[in-house]
A protein has these predicted regions:
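Mid-domain Rossmann-like dinucleotide-binding core that forms the NAD(H)/NADP(H) cofactor-binding site
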Residues: 46-131
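Conserved acidic E/D residue at the C-terminus of a beta-strand in Rossmann-like folds
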Residues: 109, 176, 200
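Glycine-rich cofactor phosphate-binding loops and adjacent beta1-alpha1 units
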Residues: 73-77, 98, 103-106, 115-195, ...
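C-terminal hydrophobic helical "lid"/dimerization subdomain
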Residues: 110, 135, 160-164, 203-254
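Glycine-rich phosphate/adenylate-binding loop and adjacent beta-alpha elements
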Residues: 1-43
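A general structural signal for well-ordered alpha-helical segments in protein cores
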Residues: 32, 44, 63-66, 90, ...
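Rossmann-fold dehydrogenase core element
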Residues: 171-173, 184-223
Length: 254
């Protein structure tokens, strides 16, 4: 909480070796019965009365990622917002985009079970598969493309799809992590005058997201489709990795 970046709210860029991304990356994480958290006075938030552990489970991440992505995307009530990817992070991004009440939201996802999840829980959201996305967005936007695009998929083709589906002067927020370098074809993009926003989540809004959960404005519980005890955590990992049984997110009980 004392370095330049922490004081600016950019806590993921903390310059201390035990700050920022340390927990679960450079030091042991939270999948244990007891956890030691450096700088806990800065990095932990009290769960409000009336909010269960299960309701709060996704606040630190991936809800923090979705909230940050929606916040920096400058969404207005007149916007058409396209979200690429309907995995756990994509759905959390959707929940936080909905807080800004844009004119319409389109979710693009290739997995049929995840598309069905979106249709079942958020019927007001338009859905489309990647091969139809560009034409669908043009047909369902007011200015030839999405006003805001949030790239949450991280597939080989989704970065290009993101800027192709954006209207001129749109905002493209890249939330996804990629396995390899992406090409930025500047000659093709030049006339679109796009604004790109990228980077890791600054988990500094957890107190606000907990308040929104307490007020009933965010509900991530439907994302927790499976629960395992800590002694069977390897089974939960395998289920999640192989995307079996319609899994979205797995909870671990200690």
């Amino acid at each position: 909480g004392e370095c330049f970046f922490c004081k600016k709210g950019f806590v993921n860029n903390c310059t201390d070796q035990n700050g920022g991304w340390a927990l679960g990356c450079r030091i042991d994480g939270g999948q244990a019965e007891y956890v030691r958290v450096p700088f806990a006075d800065q990095g932990l938030n009290k769960i409000p009365d009336g909010v269960t552990d299960r309701q709060a489970l996704l606040v630190g991440d991936v809800l923090a990622t979705g909230f940050w992505a929606a916040r920096i995307s400058e969404i207005t009530p007149e916007d058409t917002v396209l979200i690429l990817g309907a995995g756990p992070t994509g759905i959390c991004t959707l929940l936080c985009v909905m807080l800004h009440s844009p004119k319409r939201i389109i979710v693009c996802e290739k997995d049929a079970s995840r598309l069905q999840f979106i249709r079942q829980h958020y019927p007001q959201v338009l859905t489309v598969q990647p091969e139809e996305c560009a034409a669908f967005v043009r047909a369902h936007s007011d200015h030839g493309g999405a006003d805001v695009v949030l790239e949450v998929a991280g597939a080989d083709s989704t970065f290009r799809l993101a800027w192709e589906c954006a209207r001129p002067n749109a905002i493209v927020t890249v939330v996804a992590l990629y396995d390899k370098a992406q090409t930025l074809p500047l000659p093709e993009m030049y006339g679109k005058n796009l604004t790109f926003k990228t980077g890791g989540v600054d988990g500094c809004d957890c107190e606000e997201t907990l308040r929104l959960i307490a007020e009933g404005k965010i509900d991530t519980e439907p994302l927790i489709t499976h629960t395992y005890p800590l002694r069977r955590i390897a089974e939960g990992y395998e289920l999640f990795e192989k995307k079996r049984d319609g899994v979205i997110k797995v909870a671990v009980e200690c």
